[in-house]
Amino acid sequence: MAKLRQCAIYGKGGIGKSTTTQNLVAALAESGKKVMIVGCDPKADSTRLILHSKAQTTVMHLAAEAGSVEDLELEDVLSVGFGGIKCVESGGPEPGVGCAGRGVITAINFLEEEGAYDEDLDFVFYDVLGDVVCGGFAMPIRENKAQEIYIVCSGEMMAMYAANNIAKGIVKYANSGGVRLAGLICNSRNTDREDELIMALAGRLGTTMIHFVPRDNAVQHAEIRRMTMVEYDPKHKQADEYRQLANKIVNNTNFVIPTPIEMEELEELLMEFGIMEAEDESIVGQTAAELAAAAA
């Protein structure tokens, strides 16, 4: 019996973590792997493409209705979707009330106590909110739940900045546990020299770009139908991209403690690839009118 592999997907908010996670998990299931997704985001959008639903009812919502999480059964919170994929959404409190990360802690503890991590599973994927690596959202790595961390990024500066910050969070917890950075997944935004840039960033962080996922509108067409590419159009080339990503994760053994870089080094990298121009200190603090007058 192969050891259960627990993987967490982090990345900048809006980078496409949930879409990427669900598409690669669908490809894993298609290949015969037994997988569970645990959504760690109050938006509860981590399982919608697997379940063909708007949003799965969350552990926190069900616990509030029942009185407490102790009043729930595993079948209350766990749904099974495409390819036999098990789906759970942790959820969180109403916006502005309480700690959303608490839902992650509550959900994972409940799943463990109820035996959700059974011996038939090959993979568990935690789809984690944005680029937060503190508090409850760090639960998958802080408590040694997830051993493999994949960071979804793109060639945009803020996505790379978030990836570097997440790497810093991994270092903090890696020193006291087994969590490791397993690679960068580039979810393309069609920026200039994007694949080269992310490979260079991966090198600085001491890891690799495990896969470059090209941008394709077919993904949005599938999402409108609440489906993954593997299910929506299995012969499409984009479905093959997710199969390649899934296969690379299956065979991945490159798990490292990352080497995050300073902001100045990140900016130098962006300038090296022509994404960012060198800063001219002489124009700092000048209005458009002042700059125009100086140029006249």
Swiss-Prot record:
MF-aspect GO terms: 4 iron, 4 sulfur cluster binding; ATP binding; metal ion binding; nitrogenase activity
Family designation: Belongs to the NifH/BchL/ChlL family.
Reactions catalysed, as given in the entry: N2 + 8 reduced [2Fe-2S]-[ferredoxin] + 16 ATP + 16 H2O = H2 + 8 oxidized [2Fe-2S]-[ferredoxin] + 2 NH4(+) + 16 ADP + 16 phosphate + 6 H(+)
Keywords per UniProt: 4Fe-4S, ADP-ribosylation, ATP-binding, Iron, Iron-sulfur, Metal-binding, Nitrogen fixation, Nucleotide-binding, Oxidoreductase
Gene that produces this protein: nifH
Subunit structure: Homodimer.
Protein name, as recorded: Nitrogenase iron protein
Function (record text): The key enzymatic reactions in nitrogen fixation are catalyzed by the nitrogenase complex, which has 2 components: the iron protein and the molybdenum-iron protein.
Positions annotated to bind ATP: G11, K12, G13, G14, I15, G16, K17, S18
The organism of origin for this protein: Dechloromonas aromatica (strain RCB)
